[in-house]
Amino acid sequence: MTNNSPNTWQHLSSDWINWADRLAPAAEKINRHMIEAADLETLARLRGDAPLDVLDLASGVGEPAFSFARALAAPTGETTTGGGAANDAGPANSNDVSANTPHASGHVTASDIVPEMCDGLAARAAEEGIANISVIPADMENLPFSDQSFDVVSCRFGVMFCNDPDQALRESHRVLRPGGRAVYMVWAPMVDNPLFAAMDAVLGNILGIGFDQAGLDPFSFGNIDQSMDRMETAGFTGITATTHSPAGRIPEKVPFWKPQMDMLFGNVLRDASDMDRGAIDAAIFETLSPYIEDGHFQVPICFHVLSAKRA
């Protein structure tokens, strides 16, 4: 967001909490790309199999922090230490498919600029029994951590919403240990994301507010070359990027656009009339209807995963 203040996202925290559990399976699928890019097993070997410290930025109410915590969960009966914030939660969930990366264990410090998001994250971690995670409110442009505190810094769909994304990149570089890795998942351009294009057009037509009017710029890291240059300027080396375009298969009667729409525009939609809400849903359905095949929506999303090291 071009205005990365706690108040901006505080008004959306209830929407994020509302959808979190229902979106968890889909989140887990795309989070795997970040875990692979972090190359936890190789990093753990470089650290002599010592527990890794992971910092997740803009964690919202849990992802991808939960996925990283499961990937680094200690086998049953063992514990890991590291990282350092408050609000640790319950026993590890070793049944998740991403748990127990070979030769790697560790601790995740989840963070978000909105305290209410952090509270929701801590509650969900306790409910799911994730032990190797802690949570702390933090502004990624001014992190409350010492230099060289973490082995991995991760951020999914967050850095583009900062007031100063380049300062956020520099802060991530600062808190990484030498040889550590930063991994960012960012949206590709809107033209490659038909759901967002439909959302922007329909909300603009009916409510007079789209991404620009809301001060949102989800696509500012959409140009891979420019984004890699920004990471290099921040001090990172060994920068790589991959692009992913998955498409789900969702029954056409399911208004699958509501989670993303609520989590970005929930504060506006709550004031919309029932007539406007109905018109919005009808217009988005019509706009995305070319993606219906055999009674199912198959709408692609497109994102990049940027990965880099601190020398």
Residue ranges and their predicted role:
Residues 1-49, 63-67, 71, 120, ...:
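Conserved class I S-adenosyl-L-methionine
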Residues 53-143:
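Class I SAM-dependent methyltransferase SAM/SAH-binding core
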Residues 3-9, 27, 217-311:
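Conserved Class I S-adenosyl-L-methionine
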Residues 141-152:
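A short acidic, Gly/Pro-enriched loop at the edge of an enzyme's catalytic core
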Residues 72, 124-125, 203, 288, ...:
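Conserved hydrophobic residues forming the short capping helix/wall of the S-adenosyl-L-methionine
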Residues 166-167, 173, 177, 181-251, ...:
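Conserved catalytic/acceptor-binding region of the Class I
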Residues 151-165, 188:
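A short SAM/SAH-binding and catalytic strip from SAM-dependent methyltransferases
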